[in-house]
Amino acid sequence: MRVAIVGASGAVGQEFLRVLDERNFPIDELLLFGSQRSAGTKYTFRGKEIEVKLLQHNDDFKGVDIAFTSAGGGTSKDFAETITKHGAVMIDNSSAFRMDENVPLVVPECNAKDALERPRGIIANPNCTTIMMVVALQALENISHIRRIHVASYQAASGAGAAAMAELFEQYRQVLAGEKPTVEKFAYQLAFNVIPQIDVFTDNGYTKEEMKMFHETKKIMHTDADCSAMCVRVPSLRCHSEAIWAETERPVSVEEFKEAVKNGNGLRLQDDPEKKDYPMPLFLEGCDDVYVGRIRKDISNPNGLTFWLVSDQIKKGAALNAVQIAEWLIQNDPKFQG
C-alpha cells in the first residue's frame, strides 16, 4: 500500500510517523510532503530514510492509496483535488471539510460506517476535543439516548502548536527569573494562568472551538442532542481534559455507565476515589485510549451523569483517530479488498 503524509514535519505529522509504525500499518511505500520550508528534510521510518517532497499541484499522488493531511485548512482546501483526483482517499485533520455534507466526519468508535460514503474522496478527522468526548458519550448513548450535554474543556498548550508549547516553557522560565514574560501565541500569559478563550469569539458569545463541539457532535453521533461547551486553555503541556454533564432519556446508574466504559471501544476506566485514582494529563501522554473517571450522578438532575475525561489530543485527538479510520477502511471497504 502506498501512503502519503502531507504536513510531515509538523507535530501531528510526526505523530503520524510514530503511530503508523507502532500499529504496524501496512505500507509498501511512504511519501512525505511539506512546505517550501520543510522540503528536503529527511526522516527515518522503519529503517529507511525518506525525504520530504515539496507539495505541488502535479501527479505526485498518482498511485497513492491513502493520504493523511495535516497542514492546515487552507492547504487542505487548495490541494484536495490534487490529492484525490487519481483515487487516493484523503483523511484530513484540518477543519476545512468537517461540516461539508459530502464529507463524512468520523470517529471509528462511533460512526465508522460513515467513512464508506465519501463522494469527494475525503474523510474529515474531527476536532480533538470532540473526538475524546464522543468516544465516551457513545458508550452512554448505547445505554440511553442523550438529550443534552454540557462540557468544560481544559486544553493543553500543545493544542495551539509546538511554538505555543515552547512559549509556555519560556514564560515559566521568565516569570521565575523575575523577567517580563513573552506573549505571542496566546491572548495572555499562560504560565501560572488559565485563559477562558480558545479561537475567536462568534456572534453568540461562544468561541469557534466551542461551536465546533456543538456542530461536530451532532454530525458524528447523528443526534439531536445539543452540546454547550466552555473551552479553556490551561498551562499543561500535553493531553486535554474535559468535565462532562450529560442528561439521558432515562436515569442511568453509575454502575451501568462504568460497565459500559469497561467494555467500550477506545475507553479506559480509571475511577477509584478512595485511592485518589482518576485520570490526569501528567500521566497519560502517549496513551491511545480516552480515560474516564470521577463518574457520579448529577445531583441537580435525576437523569444526569457527571464524569471526567483525559486523552492525548495529539495522539487520539489527531493522528491515531485518522489511522484508525484507515485501518477500518482496509478491513471493510471493498476498494481495499484484494
Regions found by a protein language model. Name each.
Residues A67, A157-G338:
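Charged docking surfaces used in two-component/phosphorelay signaling
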Residues M1-L190, D226, E259, V290-Y291, ...:
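N-terminal Rossmann-like NAD(P) cofactor-binding subdomain of oxidoreductases
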